[in-house]
């Protein structure tokens, strides 16, 4: 199974069907970002996630975003070990914003 996708791969998946996004950025520092219509974005700061696992559904696949995709890669491994289906989006919201601007 592929545990990471590029922004372009993520956008192709999101264009086909609604996706579940887990935005792990600090709410005080970062603005939320908008995805394709119908996508579900859950914002939980990275530092709070271990205490918020009850908000996640093990039957869903989540695409993880941090600002640059580094911290989300580490958290993806943690969540997989906890039984969740997660995929890291390489480059995070920075790459996502660059993709939209191009």
Question: Locations of the language-model features?
Answer:
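Rhodanese-like catalytic fold shared by cysteine-dependent sulfurtransferases
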Residues: 1-19, 27-61, 70-102
